[in-house]
A protein has these predicted regions:
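Active-site cores of enzymes that catalyze phosphoryl transfer or operate on phosphate-rich substrates
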Residues: 238-287, 292, 299
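Glycine-rich phosphate/ribose-binding loops and adjacent secondary-structure elements
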Residues: 8-10, 21, 26-27, 31, ...
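Short glycine-rich or small-residue beta-strand-to-loop segments that form or flank ligand, phosphate
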Residues: 13-14, 46, 170-175, 379
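Conserved, well-structured core domains of diverse proteins
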Residues: 1-6, 33, 57, 61-262, ...
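Conserved active-site-proximal phosphate/metal-binding subdomains
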Residues: 3-9, 75-119, 341-357, 365-377, ...
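Short linker/helix segments within small regulatory modules
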Residues: 37-51, 72
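Flexible, glycine/charged-enriched surface loops at secondary-structure junctions
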Residues: 199-204, 303-310, 373, 466-475
């Protein structure tokens, strides 16, 4: 029997003078951290199972609980840090690949925080969004190079299919199975109310959600789970998932424990079987192959829906995007290395890919240099945390942004990063019925609507301060940005000047 070397990461601090042994913590914890000692009439806890999801802390009626990070550490070593050593212990115990959830948590540069936004002062007037109109509406899809008119002044150009958004934000792909039915419904309800879109992810679309089709993007991934003619025609757009920011170069994996009931039927795979998406699409090994799938999907939907191609931000992303822009795709979605996931190998999540800020700037500039920027719209994701990040992304060249982790937080996620376990105490990343019901989709959607409404107000305020009254005028306007704490090469790639210049 092996010795367990790993000390619990978190400690449960219980104020015995406040605790009334109501056992709420015991009932609410899917990880079975808390238990009641009948003999001594007290609550006990197994701290080795605690993931710091804060469910017990939030629901304790007397505020008797708090979770703190353990101060029990190994001897300090700059090379062999505590996390590194504990990961080796885990692999020595299990012999398996380490799995993690959410995005890259390492203390690597966050370029959004090193970019500052301009404001109008004296020489050019700012705009008051409370008193003057501000246009946050955007259209995604292929645009003509120039506007042509008939002799009577009417437009003489036919636009390919476009996606209309009330603001430049969409809910990113999170599959049914990785998140719960109620979480998906929350996203669908919110997207419909807000006039934006949400993405089904690679798990198909539950039959109950077909009614939200006008605000839905359906995804086709390498596993082709849940893909059929009705599914393709159900949404307003189709996204081909070639890669994901949290795990570039590999496919998805949803454990069989989550393939139950409606998830099994929606994905069209046997109940209890692992849903393993191949690393590549086995019909795509070149840009020409991608072009064939793009036009196959257009044919299947009678050229009525824009086609999105989603890729992870990797080292040669500008060249990849150039090829995609020539493939017939209408929109390119790029996912940065901090993008979230329900489960990914830890080594890949923490070491593969590049920041979305650098990828976006490089792609936008490459497409402009090649004269094909209007061939596609650019949507970026991978840790878009606030309205300020959205504004900076658009100024760097994006047409719109994908958000996912921020949406999960709005629904109640506490970022404990154990989505892969299926034991989400907040009813989001789980398929256990007793946990799923903890998320009320009416409340979840209301909180999402509140978040996006707040962001929309903030986007208008930031634009107004710059003297800009439309997203179109902001897109690619890098003169509105300045860098701080960046070196010359970083500034060159981002295409911005240093603060003070």
């Amino acid at each position: 029997m092996s010795v367990e070397f790993i000390y619990p990461e978190f400690e449960v601090i219980r104020n015995e003078s406040k605790c009334i042994a109501c056992r709420v913590c015991e009932r609410q914890c899917a990880n079975e951290v808390h238990s009641y000692d009948e003999e001594h009439k007290i609550m006990k806890c197994d701290e080795s199972k605690c993931v710091n999801c804060q469910r017990c802390v939030s629901l304790c009626p007397t505020r008797a609980l708090k979770i703190v990070k353990s101060d029990c550490t190994l001897r300090e070593n700059a090379n062999w840090q505590n996390d590194t050593i504990k990961e080796i212990y885990k692999q020595a115990n299990s012999g398996g690949v380490l799995l993690s959830s959410m995005g890259n948590p390492k203390p690597l540069p966050v370029y959004w925080d090193k970019i500052l936004i301009n404001a109008s002062q004296v020489t050019n007037p700012s705009i008051d969004p409370l008193r003057e109109p501000m246009e946050t509406r955007v259209y995604l899809g292929k645009k003509p190079e120039k506007v042509q008119r008939n002799k009577d002044g009417t437009l003489n150009c036919e636009l390919p299919p476009q996606l209309e958004l009330s603001m430049p934000v969409m809910f990113s792909a999170m599959s049914y199975g990785s998140i719960s039915y109620n979480a998906h419904k929350s996203l669908a309800l919110a997207a419909t109310e807000l006039g934006i879109l949400y993405n089904t992810g690679e798990g198909g679309l539950h039959e109950d959600f077909y009614c939200y089709g006008e605000n839905t993007i359906v995804q086709v991934a390498s596993g082709r789970f849940g893909v059929h003619e009705d599914y393709l025609n159900a949404g307003s757009a189709i996204e081909i998932k070639m890669g994901q920011g949290a795990k570039p170069g590999i496919g998805g994996h949803l454990p069989g424990a989550k393939i139950v009931g409606d998830v099994s039927r929606t994905r069209m795979i046997p109940e209890g079987s692992d849903a393993i998406s191949p690393a590549p699409h086995h019909d795509i090994y070149s840009i020409e192959d991608l072009r064939q799938l793009v036009f196959s999907l257009k044919e299947a939907t009678e050229y009525k829906k824009p086609i999105i191609v989603k890729v992870a931000a990797v080292h040669n992303i500008a060249a990849i995007a150039s090829g995609i822009a020539r493939s017939g795709a209408d929109i390119i979605a790029i996912d940065g290395f901090r993008g979230g996931t329900g489960a990914a190998p830890t080594r890949i999540r923490d070491n593969v890919g590049i920041p979305i800020e650098l990828a976006l700037a490089a792609v936008d500039q490459r497409l402009r240099d090649e004269g094909i920027r209007n061939n596609v719209s650019l949507v970026v994701g991978g840790s878009i945390r606030s309205a300020a990040d959205v504004v900076k992304a658009i100024a760097l060249g994006a047409d719109a942004c994908y958000v996912a982790t921020a949406a999960l937080l709005a629904m109640g996620c506490h970022l404990c990063r154990t989505c892969q376990s299926g034991k989400c105490n907040w009813g989001i990343a789980t398929q256990r019925p007793e946990l799923v019901k903890r998320l009320n989709p009416e409340i979840g959607s209301e909180r999402l609507i509140n978040l996006m409404t707040a962001w929309k107000h903030e986007i208008k305020e930031l634009m107004g301060g710059m003297g800009i009254n439309s997203i179109e005028a902001l897109r690619g306007n890098r003169l509105m940005l300045r860098g701080i704490g960046l070196n010359e090469k970083e500034l060159e790639i981002l295409g911005i000047s240093y603060a003070g210049e």
